Every structure is written in structure tokens, then in C-alpha cells.
Amino acid sequence: MAADDKIQMWNPNTGRPDVKIDRAKFDAVRKAILQALPRKGSAIPFKELPLAAELNLPDGQIPGGGSVMWYVTTVKLHMEHEGELERVAGETPQVVRRVK
């Protein structure tokens, strides 16, 4: 992986760019989240998403290391910004639903 092979994360709460993360980590976490929400309309409480995603990660870990909770949260926010996921309105605690 090239040193500059990073992807810019976006935060839907601010509409602004957030951190940049390694593309390999992004791809692995995004895939794990989508596997945890296998169909359009699938939903899961956010507090359960990190464990559900972790079960779909290679060896249950972030490739190259890192906090599963941090990466799942960061990638989930980016996926909300991109319209792949959405928060279910009126649900407390937060529930996340697959849109695409």
C-alpha cells in the first residue's frame, strides 16, 4: 500500500471533512458493516454494530491494528454522509439502517 493510499472521511453531523484513514482499513470495515447489515432496510442498534462488524473482520481485527470501535464509528459516519446508511428517526438509543 502506498503511503498516500488514504481516504478522506466525512462527518454527516458537520458536513465537513474529518480524518483520513488507510484505504485498506476503510475497505475492510465498510465491508464488515455491510455484512452486518446484509440487505437494504436492515437495521441494528448502533451499540451492537461494533461487535457485529468485528465478527466480519479478518481475524476479528482491523487490518494493521487499531480500535474496532473507533474505526466502525468513523466509517459509519462516512457511510451516513455518503447515503449508504442512515439513522432511524425517533429511535433512542441510535439505530442504524442500510439504505443502499
Q: Where would I find each of the regions flagged by the language model?
A:
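Short amphipathic alpha-helical interaction segments
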Residues: 63-81
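A short, conserved structural fragment
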Residues: 80-90
